[in-house]
């Protein structure tokens, strides 16, 4: 039987608080050709994460699909262990496009450092192995398992978390509030080749719906 309970609850919420809050994710993108230092700024009520994507400068060139490291090559042989690795499920063919091939622009001695308003995040310069560990911890439910070699050659994406764990599930704005003082970010690397850098600032925004269909967006 149809009721108007939901409408009553909505009206009571608007009457008590003044508006109905509808949180949603918002993303801001920054692109540059990176050699050693790239700068950006973020102004948001809740800056949750920073996603860093490294690609070769010729990533837009059309070419054949690229085999993922460790999986079967053109001759049908796996490139890690005989029979494939059960942990990484490499006993099959797997391909990605050149556009979505994210490659570590450095070597094993390369260090990565993020500064937000002159504060280091984390407090030391990371290697690519440490970046993989940090990225897995920055996502509440990591699903993909990969080797360090696959990470550096095919899926090199770094994620810096600024929000509390499980805040996405509860839709809580627990990230950095950078509205009064805009966050000035600097990404520094050592011993890297020139690459195409794309930054995604993941933020929690809020749509406020008031009486009389009045709306407001809090970035």
Show which residues each predicted segment covers.
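Flexible assembly/topogenesis modules
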Residues: 1-219
């Amino acid at each position: 039987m149809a009721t108007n309970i939901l409408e009553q609850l909505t009206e009571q919420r608007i009457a008590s608080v003044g508006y109905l809050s509808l949180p949603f994710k918002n993303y801001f993108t920054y692109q540059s050709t990176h050699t050693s230092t790239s700068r950006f700024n973020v102004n948001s009520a809740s800056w949750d994460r920073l996603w860093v994507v490294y690609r070769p400068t010729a990533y837009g060139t059309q070419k054949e699909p690229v085999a993922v490291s460790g999986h079967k090559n053109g001759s049908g042989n796996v490139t890690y262990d005989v029979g494939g690795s059960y942990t990484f499920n490499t006993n099959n063919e797997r391909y990605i496009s050149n556009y979505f091939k994210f490659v570590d622009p450095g070597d094993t001695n390369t260090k990565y450092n993020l500064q937000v308003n002159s504060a280091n995040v984390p407090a030391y310069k990371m290697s690519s192995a440490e970046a993989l560990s940090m990225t897995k911890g920055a996502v509440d439910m990591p699903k993909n398992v990969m080797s360090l070699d696959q990470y550096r050659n095919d899926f090199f994406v770094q994620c810096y978390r600024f929000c509390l764990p499980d805040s996405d599930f509860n839709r809580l704005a627990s990230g950095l509030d950078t509205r009064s003082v805009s966050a000035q970010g600097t990404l520094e690397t050592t011993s890297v080749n020139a690459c195409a850098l794309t930054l995604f600032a993941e933020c929690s925004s809020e749509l406020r719906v008031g009486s009389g269909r009045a709306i407001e967006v809090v970035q």
